[in-house]
Design a protein with these regions (language model features):
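Bacterial N-terminal signal peptides
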Residues: 9-20
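Phosphate-group recognition and catalysis centered on beta-loop-alpha active-site segments
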Residues: 22-415
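Bacterial N-terminal signal peptides that target proteins for export
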Residues: 2-10
Length: 415
């Protein structure tokens, strides 16, 4: 039986590869070529027998890039996040939209990094003595006697743009038990890989990301990251200037508003864009962080404020909560939450995050699956959840750390 299942999986993987990798006419723009690799077929093979599995197995190519499939920081399941290699991998897997999380350097230049102060865990800055000495908090080794973990804090605002661009990206992670810098930077989770982290993956400025995404023919979704330094920075760079500079760089590159999905967790940023940049703000995405409130309950509308109707009336068109907020476990099945239904009824479009960020799912799935832990027993739940989000919640897109999965679903199951 195991040999038969392996054979079926191998046949499906080969079929998907043939559909996606071998049907490009000579001379065709490679930015439109989609190559999924074996992971989507592996997930399909894990699905229980039924209509979803059958439809995905019978799906015919060629597959195309799709806006439903959003590359979360590129393709960081296997490539260092926010690097050129990661973005190119996401585009190759058919992500129609690519994300640059935006923060700023000491000379107030915008760069792609998930957090202003994560350089110690996503780049090789600590291995560069000339730059490591500029970190806000130098490396401190673990102390087993006191139980103190190893730590460091290196921020984009500690260095200038040219220094930032000299860094190499690495897989996100640190080793809290480290007693040396060399040990500390080796913290990649075992369900990811360092296989594609060699040869100094290039980090990018925001402007460079725009040029790359234009070259790849993809739409763009920058997230204005919350500053981890006091604003106004250096006494003269305000939050509104920061938000405006982000939009100005798209204007300068000639990127039309319909190609850009601005994002922020800060509602004040959304309001600023609605007033100052109404054309770009039509597709602004409010990343809903209200789940951090202990009283928040996606099944209880009274636990969140403003209401969905109030958000829509303020001019918001797209709301983006994490995966678990949009679903609930009901009679052994994944179903839309009250939050999802309220957003639908208010006329809000929905984007969600982040698929393929939880490692293996046979242990309940962790944070992103917390509302359906009892149903999360194997890796195929990623596709089952995606199916409910697309067909019952009606999301317009899903961020993924491995966009091949969302690309396959979008091509095979969406109009």
């Amino acid at each position: 039986m195991m040999r038969r299942q392996w054979g079926l999986w191998l046949n499906l993987a080969l079929s998907l590869w043939l559909l996606t990798g071998c049907q490009q006419p000579a001379g065709q723009d490679t930015s439109a070529r989609v190559e999924l690799g074996p992971r989507p077929a592996y997930l399909v093979a894990q699905l229980p027998e039924g209509e979803l599995k059958q439809q995905l197995q019978q799906c015919q190519g060629p597959l195309q890039p799709h806006d439903f499939s959003i590359g979360h920081r590129g393709a960081p399941l296997m490539f260092p996040e926010h690097t050129e290699a990661s973005y190119r991998a996401a585009a190759q897997m058919g992500a129609g939209i690519l994300e640059c999380d935006v923060t700023f350097t000491r000379d107030r230049q915008l760069v792609c990094r998930h957090a202003q102060c994560d350089l110690h865990q996503t780049t090789d800055i600590l291995l560069r003595p000339e730059l490591a000495g500029r970190c806000s908090q130098p490396f401190q080794p673990a102390d087993a006697a006191s139980g103190r973990p190893a730590s460091a804090r290196c921020c984009t605002s500690d260095i200038d743009l040219d220094e930032y661009l000299s860094l190499c990206g690495k897989m996100d992670g640190v080793n809290p038990a480290a007693t040396s810098v060399q040990q500390y930077v080796q913290g990649t989770p075992d369900w990811r890989t360092d296989l594609y982290a060699g040869s100094c993956p290039a980090v990018l400025s925001h402007q460079q990301s725009i040029a790359l995404f234009q070259q790849l023919g993809r739409k763009m979704t920058p997230e204005l990251k919350t500053a981890e330094v006091s604003m106004p920075f250096q006494g003269r760079f305000s939050q509104q200037q920061y938000a405006q500079q982000l939009v100005d760089e798209y204007k300068a590159a000639g990127v039309p508003p319909e190609q850009v999905f601005l994002q922020s967790f800060d509602w004040q940023d959304i309001l600023y864009w609605l007033q100052a940049e109404p054309d770009y703000a039509k597709q602004a995405v409010w990343l809903d962080g209200r789940y951090e409130d202990p009283a928040f309950d996606p099944m209880q509308p009274g636990s969140w404020s403003p209401s969905m109707d109030e958000l829509k009336a303020a001019g918001l068109n797209i709301i983006a909560p994490p995966l678990w907020v949009l679903v609930t476990s009901e009679e052994g099945a994944i179903r839309p939450s009250a939050y999802a239904k309220a957003a639908q009824q208010a006329g809000l479009n929905i984007i969600s995050w982040t698929l393929e960020r939880s490692g293996r799912l046979d242990d309940g799935g962790g944070w992103y699956y917390q509302s359906i832990t009892d149903l999360t027993t194997d890796d195929s739940v990623a596709l089952q959840l995606l199916h409910v989000l697309a067909q019952e919640v009606g999301v317009m897109g899903v961020f993924s750390d491995w966009p091949a999965t969302t690309t396959l679903y979008a091509n095979c199951m969406l109009p």
